[in-house]
Structures are given as structure tokens and as C-alpha cells.
């Protein structure tokens, strides 16, 4: 009721002033920010990419940098996107896995702990070699298909599930373990942070988290020669021959986005984590067919979903695209550049064209959540570039939207959780 009154009040205020209701597009190319890369002639992927729509808007926008990951926190997408959506991660972050579980429709009960379960690729098993000596080769097992991964998850449940724990299939390599009564305080190593390294020093501590460690080793034994993996090897693909557990947490609770801003908001994303944040914040969540969370995602489908959300009454649409992040993790420089170009051409351009055709005032904000440098193949906590565009005003922006041009504007926001309010205020005042 409070949210309805706030939404109605906004519309009444607009009517009395004879102005149109604002529409807001927030576009998140996950992990887009990077470092200069020799392969690109010393340019970053943002500098190398042909992105005319971003650059056109940035030239008329407020431009700056923002820190989405608070000091002392791990630079994960849950932390950064929570901040962008105005929720202070220092207060509300309970780990990414519970958010993913919510998105997957899992009914978490008291005492349940959600744990991310990656299907990963470890170096081939060598007779007599300790499990600890194996090397993390790929956190995504060559971006295994959901269908193949589902068969692996079923095998895990048949052999390792019991009354207290159960595995749930997610998308591609991203899955979930629900374990009632498990410890949620242990800080796990992230598989994407240890590519090329022996896993021994990164496994859960035997004394502090021995149950998790035992489950990981048992799961690996089950998957090593699974028919799915033998078939993948025969096709020249990496096997998903192990599981890696991380980011344990209990069910989160977020304030209502609608209560906070008086806006009916929709999330468009392929990633359970982002959809989970939206659901916990009372936002509408759209599932896009063919949205994979990588370079092969349905870019056009995401644009269509955003446009449909506006047509169906959404005031704000939050479009998250995972592709640049995955390319960073996989050290795929050319694909990272391509992903930025596809986001610009197939998502931002058509949604902007729709908004311009409607006659309503609107705002557009574009920023990555965190950097995912190709060189490092993992996230960093560095500030990221942003621009805020309002159809009602023309600011002195930048000719090309990049890390360097944004930093040169000397408009740094130290707290990403204040960014959304700043964007709305900028567009409406």
C-alpha cells in the first residue's frame, strides 16, 4: 500500500505540473572496465570497442567514476550490483548464493545455508596423485551447457544428497547446494581467482570446514569419468570433472525498491544472482529465452524484454549483461571488445530508439559493476566509469566513454549505494 501511494503520488505530482513521467534505463555491462592491453595497442576494451551509442550519450551526460565495492569487501557481482541498486552491501550482503537460490525458486527454510556449486575443470587425474595437487584449469568447464550440467547434478544428488542437503541445477556451470545446519561463516576461495594454480592451499580448511572439503572431494570422484565428461573429452571440450563450493550464506532480506523510490522496476538478466537481488527487493524479474550469461547470449532478446517492460508499465528497467565479465575471466580480449560492441548495438541502441519515440522524458545510466581485467582474469575493487544521461538536459560530457575519460572528469563517488538516488535526482531536477 505504501509503495502504491508513493507511485500514485509521483504520477499526481507529474500531472499537476503537466510533465511526463520519467522512464529510467540502467545498463550494466558486467566487468566491462579493464586495463590497457598490449594486444589492443595499449587500449582498454572500452577504448577499442566501436560503441557509438554509448559515446553519443556520454557526450551529453554527467560522467565520472564510482566505487561500488566497499573497502574490505570481496569484489563480487552481488556486492557491486547491490550497491548500484542502492542497497549498502556492508549492511545487506549475505553472500551471492542465497540470492541465486531465491532466483531459482528454492524455498529456503530456517537453518538452510545456500552454497554456490561450480562445475569446474581440474587437471587430469594421475594415479597416486593427491587431490590437493590438481590444478584449477577452468571455473566454468568451457561454459558447460545447462543440459549437460543437469545430468551431473542428478548424479551428485543420487550419491551425496540426504535429508539435510540437496543440489539444485542452475544455468551452465552455476549451481546451488542447500545444506541445512551448515556453517555459513567460512570464507571460501573463488574458483575464478585461482585459475592455473594447485587447489591444495585454496581448499576449505579440514578443521574449520571439513564437511565442505569432504563433499568437494567426493563430488570430484563421482564426476571424473561421468559419461557426460567422457563425451565432452571426445568432442575436444574440457570436462566438468569436479565441483567447487563457495560463498555460503543464509536467506537475505532487502528493502523494497518500490517503497524506496516510488518506481515500478524490472530486472532483465541471465544470471540468477542478479535476478535474486531483484526478487528480494520486490522488483519484477524477466526471464529471456536464450540468455546464457556469455558472449553467445540473446542480446536482442534482452533489448526486447526491456522495451516490453517499459510498455507494460515499468518506470525503471535494470538490464544486466554478463558477457564482458565472462570474457575477462576467460582472458578473451577480442571477445570482450566484441561483447561491448554487441551491447551497444543490440541492446542500448534499440532501447534508446524506443524511449526517444515515446515522447516521455527519460534517463539512461551505463556503468560496469566492477572491473574484470583480462590480464588478471578476476574482479578488482577499482572504481568504474559511469555516465548519467537525461533527455531534459545536456551536460558537458566526454567524446568517448572510457575509463580514462571518466576519471579525467574528477567526479568520483566513493559510495556506490548513493549512485541510484543521484541518478534519479539528476534526471528529475
Each PLM stretch: what is its role?
Residues 15-429:
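Feature captures the catalytic ectodomains and active-site-proximal regions of enzymes
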